[in-house]
Regions:
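Serine-hydrolase catalytic machinery in alpha/beta-hydrolase-like enzymes
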Residues: 4-101, 148-149, 202-207
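Alpha/beta-hydrolase fold nucleophile elbow
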Residues: 99-111
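Short beta-strand immediately N-terminal to the catalytic nucleophile in serine-hydrolase-like folds
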Residues: 108-110, 134, 163
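Gly/Ala-rich beta-loop-alpha elbow adjacent to hydrolase catalytic centers
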Residues: 110-114, 118
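A conserved short beta-strand
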Residues: 127-138
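Short beta-strand/loop motif that positions the catalytic acidic residue
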Residues: 156, 162-164
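Conserved alpha/beta-hydrolase "acid-adjacent" motif
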Residues: 169-175
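C-terminal catalytic histidine-bearing segment of alpha/beta-hydrolase fold enzymes
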Residues: 184-242
Length: 242
């Protein structure tokens, strides 16, 4: 079951698309950081799929602070890392407050700009026990005046699974290799998968120009076991994030 809900973050209403497993009361959670178009049909589908796999899945609308006008790049350009961190934290706290549920470990995945968000959060909050980065661009660029996600690599607290298309320009394979080397440098557990016949947004089935069925299926089929290995169901009480 999946539906829209709404919370308030820093005085601004933020919508969330929430997928709830149909069985049980105790389960891990996965935050789904959306791609440039926002929480659209593709992101909703990923939330629903994760819920069917037994995860409480939540996709927050990271654009909630800004007006809807502007193209994708303009809207991405308005995002600020401190605000994004606050939004993701609010989504985790929302999961922890849900009635009749017992929350286990929390992971995060993201696509395109959301892949960058997943990398950022892996370094920003130790609450996350796993991060899935799907063709995350601009990991080496800041949103605002703070450090880049790349600069924060020493503070990463969880294993990362990355999925990248060899034909992508952002991130390019050179970018991917540089990020992997940085993770190696700081001995951060990661597995990176590169697909030679895919470019950016190769999982997005709503875009025939970029979708690649084979790589998309393979990447998702690798993500689910990764989450199963890293996220556990727990009955221990959790503290609210600040």
């Amino acid at each position: 079951m999946a539906q829209w809900d709404q919370i308030t973050v820093d005085g601004s209403p933020m919508r969330l698309y929430v997928g709830m497993p149909s069985l049980g009361r105790a389960f891990p959670a996965v935050i789904v950081a959306h791609h440039g178009p926002g929480v659209d049909k593709f992101i909703e589908d990923r939330v629903e799929h994760l819920a069917r796999q037994g995860y409480l899945a939540i996709a927050p609308d990271l654009y909630h602070r800004q007006a809807e006008e502007g193209d994708v790049l303009t809207r991405i350009g308005r995002l600020q890392d401190p605000e994004v961190i606050a939004d993701v934290n609010a989504a985790v706290n929302y999961a922890r407050r849900l009635k009749d549920t017992q929350l286990g470990d929390v992971g995060i995945i993201g696509f395109c700009m959301g892949g960058r968000v997943a990398y950022l959060m892996a370094a920003s909050k130790p609450v996350f026990k796993a991060a899935g980065v799907f063709y995350g661009g601009n990991i080496m660029k800041p949103w605002g005046n703070g450090p880049t996600p790349f600069d924060l690599t020493p503070y990463i607290h969880c294993p990362i699974a990355g999925f990248f298309g060899a034909e992508d320009a952002n991130p390019s394979l050179e970018d991917v290799d540089r990020i992997s080397a940085q993770l190696d440098r700081y001995r951060k557990a990661h597995e990176f998968h590169r697909y030679p016949d895919a470019g950016h947004a190769f999982l997005n089935f709503t875009n025939p120009a970029t979708y690649r069925e084979g790589p998309a299926r393979d990447a998702w089929d690798k993500l689910i076991p990764f989450l199963q290995r890293t996220l556990q169901t727990s009955r221990q009480p959790r503290q609210r994030l600040s």
